[in-house]
Swiss-Prot record:
Keywords: Membrane, Transmembrane, Transmembrane helix. It comes from the Eukaryota. Partially overlaps FAR3 and STB2. It comes from Saccharomyces cerevisiae (strain ATCC 204508 / S288c) (Baker's yeast). The chain crosses the membrane at residues 1-21, 55-75, 92-112. It is a multi-pass membrane protein. Coiled coil: none annotated. This is Putative uncharacterized protein YMR052C-A. It is found in: Membrane.
Amino acid sequence: MILWGGSGGYLVIILYTIMPVKTIEEYEYDFFRFILIFFFFQKGSKHLSVVISILKYINAFKGLLFHVCLHFCSIHRRLFQYLVRVLQVFQLFFKAAVISGIFRYTIPIHFLQKFFKLFDN
């Protein structure tokens, strides 16, 4: 994924290293936001819809992980943060690959094309 993501992927990884772990309230928000988006947001091109769906499912999985850990497990907070961090890494790799790979060829929007040129060598 990183190789396919190109320099955009490396930029996201650098940004990731300075990002804090989300709070529990933010994961709860992600979970409910996923439900709303799933039912009300089904627009865009076929490729864009697939990408958005994958990102929605990743966010939903993080939300479900939060609820399971909070209500049914006596899991240590550090372990929970580690699991969340693994999911964040996967999500950021996927976003980086999408930004520098797919969107360039599927969205014919002028300002987005200019933006993606910044990530090219």
